[in-house]
Amino acid sequence: MNIRLFKVGLIVISISSCSNKTVQESLLTIDTLLQNKADTLLTTSMIEHQATSGKAIIMETATGYIKAMVGLERKDTLSPFQPTTDFCTPYPTEQRQIATLLAALETGKISLSDTVDVGEGIYISDSDTIKDHNWHRGGYGKITVEWAIAANSRIGEVLIRERAFDDNKSEYEAAIGQIGYGKPDSVKGLDCILNTDVAASKISPIQLITFYNAIANHGRMVQPQLYKDSVAIINPQIASKASIDSVCQTLERTITEGLGKRANTDKTKVAGKGGTIQIGNPDDLTYIMDFCGYFPTNNPRYTILVILEKQGLPASGHIHAAGLFRKIVEQLIQNK
């Protein structure tokens, strides 16, 4: 079969040769109107927050069909935007917290109502100093497991992991793999090999949205698709219904009471979580902000991931990325 590159909007997809462009486009899951809307929203957000890189992916929850996939980058805030098609490279993110919670719940050693003591927001683990975002305000102290995730406590994640898996890193990483965090290994139409670095909290954008989509699907993980093929199942049930329900409850609380309030909208009920990672040296700090979630919560139709990268503060996944997530949700509702 002859395969070539085919451009739709701002993404390039490898596609079988066909007789005409109309036939080619009809094979793809991309919604051209939605692709253009997502591009506009991403561009506006990047200008507003002075971001140098940004990505947005919209996936149909039940099928795994990718309805929009936009990537933009620029050398600095004065340079023009250029499209990027890299949705496969693992990037550092705090989103592993959700995978840690689900894997821990599956052991039966952890429940949402259990408490963890994150103290004053500073914790030493394996010679690494871990700080919560509010460490300079005295930290959270004793909190429930559910609130640790909803409040984006890095220390909370470590304590949850330690309680469920002790110091057995190989057992933890195996448990993370068991629930599908880091799947799939490839996507037809994306010319890349997908990798995940659990130990370094790195995962590719397409793998992260696939994991969240499985949670939205009540544990059913479907293969992300750029072609209108039949739905392909990666795993019919990544975890028990009880554990999935607990994670969904936590993601909903993140929106209503936790750090994800900026993603909330009065047009529908959403669930999701954000994160912020600082990279680079102290003289040239770069921040990677993301937010991933789904809606509506009672019967999810779409799963969305947004990622923004910028130099310097202010930078927050639960503010900047969450705001873009909300705008995409409202655009999808408007398009109905």
What does each model-identified segment do?
Residues 223-224, 228-336:
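Conserved SxxK-family serine transpeptidase/carboxypeptidase catalytic domain
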Residues 70, 86-95, 183-233:
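Active-site-proximal helix/loop microenvironment
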Residues 62, 110-113, 118-172, 233-245:
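Conserved catalytic neighborhood of penicillin-recognizing serine enzymes
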Residues 79, 105-126, 219-228:
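Short, well-structured active-site flanking segments
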Residues 13-25:
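Bacterial Sec-dependent signal peptides at the C-terminal "C-region" and cleavage site
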Residues 37-38, 64, 88-116, 148, ...:
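Active-site SXXK
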